[in-house]
């Protein structure tokens, strides 16, 4: 009898199937503007890879790859410009111009976090990294945070903040 009971319990445990249900957890909060009160969820791996590839492609001077990942016009906001500027695709000339003062650029990414605001049709990926700009034997080091806006797997806006590294 003990053997039959043990066999029955073992069979019951083996035949049980664990059911896993994934739930998107919302967090954070929008505090200002038309989206006040809306929360965020973690964005997609696809958007994460696009943003990281874009950041690396710029440092490597692969402007054709950057053009493939962007919409017809990308709005770029960098603090020294004062306001967002529209960059028309292909952007090779614009990108070459802003890289022209430097012999080369390297970037070391610290982290990248994809987010999607509840109810929105786009995701943002915040990428923070160290950028080294080499020029005539000297190195200019910057801490940079890019917030890259992605809709339908295409970048349509980049907001950038930077500061110097001591």
Label each region the model flagged.
Residues 16-60, 68:
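Short, low-complexity N-terminal intrinsically disordered segments enriched in polar/charged residues
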Residues 83, 132-141:
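Short, cysteine-centered beta-strand-loop-beta hairpins and adjacent loop/turn segments enriched
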Residues 121-131:
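A short hydrophobic beta-strand element
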Residues 1-4, 17:
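Positively charged n-region of N-terminal signal peptides that target proteins for export
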Residues 70, 80, 129-131, 146, ...:
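A mature extracytoplasmic/lumenal domain signature
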Residues 4-13:
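Sec-dependent N-terminal signal peptides
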Residues 19-23, 141-166:
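Short beta-strand edge/turn micro-motifs at domain boundaries
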Residues 63-115:
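A solvent-exposed, acidic/Ser-Thr-rich amphipathic alpha-helical stretch
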